[in-house]
Amino acid sequence: AAYYKMTLNGKSITSSHLNPGFTHYDKRNLYNTYDVTSQLLKGENVLSAILGNGFYNESAPVATWSYEQARWRNRPRMICEMEILYKNGEKQTIHSDSTWKTSIGPYIQNNIYSGDTYDACLAIAGWDKPGFDDSKWTNAIQAAAPSPLLVSQNMPAIETEQFITPINMRSFGDTVYVYDFGVNMSGVCTLSINGKKGTKVSMQHGELLKLSLIHISEPTRP
């Protein structure tokens, strides 16, 4: 339940986003399947995941539909299997269990409505690639299933349709910048940052501009 980002040998196993789809998480949960044959390496392979809260563990009190009061709320959890079919016809199944290793990471807070807090100082280089030493990490804890039903997701996935660059930028001093993308859309921002360790960068999204400023009193989503 909740959202995940999964990689195999450091590369994402899918181009889609916000998986799996929404359900009443205490009644049924969706799972996704992927063909990762092209990402397998000879020798060691590393399957890794980052878990996010999604709508399963929505905590923001301003959440539409009061998801913060949902009866299914709980900490994110996952289950996965990898089926390997060899040329000789033999099949091997690798599944998640308490032998998997876990650690804190740079995503120290994440929320559908209020966004993410990412601390680059906590980023761990190479953590999802072969050769990484996870001996100091802790073992995963087996958790109860959120619901009795696990169902294959048939709905279309959320995919990136296009990349949009700002049509205008206005600065207010040397610390505040407003970028106008010229269209109301669902998406995420990408940026490259150079700065001293400990520097904080905040992004506020808005649906309207008034007097070149983000008008945050109107319905907006971060």
Predicted regions and their residues:
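Extracellular/oxidizing-compartment recognition motifs
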Residues: 1-213, 217, 221
